[in-house]
Amino acid sequence: MIRILARGLAYLHNFCFRACNRVLMYGYLQKFRSAGEHVLFSPLGSVLSYSTITLGHHVFIANRAWFSGEIEIGSYVMFGPNVTILGGDHEFKDITQPMFFVKDNQQRQAKIKIGNDVWVGANVTILKGVEIGQGAIIAAGSVVNKSVEPFSIVGGVPAKKIAERFTQAEKQAYISHSHHWSK
């Protein structure tokens, strides 16, 4: 009996959480600098600096995302759970005060750009100034501190190139068929 009740409560909790997330998502979409069509994300479980983020069409951001800074995300982009994107860092060379009290300034910020058709795996951290090229894949658990070439598969800490997603001929065919990315 207790098991049945526990399962029922778990189902009810999941249903309510998902329903609240959907309702809130539509309200929070207006807070982004701009957002394309068919954007899905979880406002209840994420921390996003909405006013500095630009989203393309068909973007999926899984639970527990932390996006901070000037971020431009293309179309057809998927983010796994627990992805962190940090567009800045803290000043640590001010000898007049502890790091705790030093406020972020513009010199410590750098825009992050993520191209079209990118897949970012779970638990990935992307640091300031990085540009991720079209068609790239970032393996789960990676820390991306340098730009990623188009159609590359990268992974590790720090992220390094593992493989190419396509051969040169496949890249050309892909590019000739990707005219709909801007729609």
Residue ranges and their predicted role:
Residues 1-31, 36-38, 76, 89-95, ...:
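Terminal amphipathic alpha-helical/low-complexity segments used for targeting or macromolecular assembly
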Residues 40-42:
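Conserved beta-hairpin
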Residues 131, 147:
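Residues immediately N-terminal to the Walker A/P-loop in ABC ATPase nucleotide-binding domains
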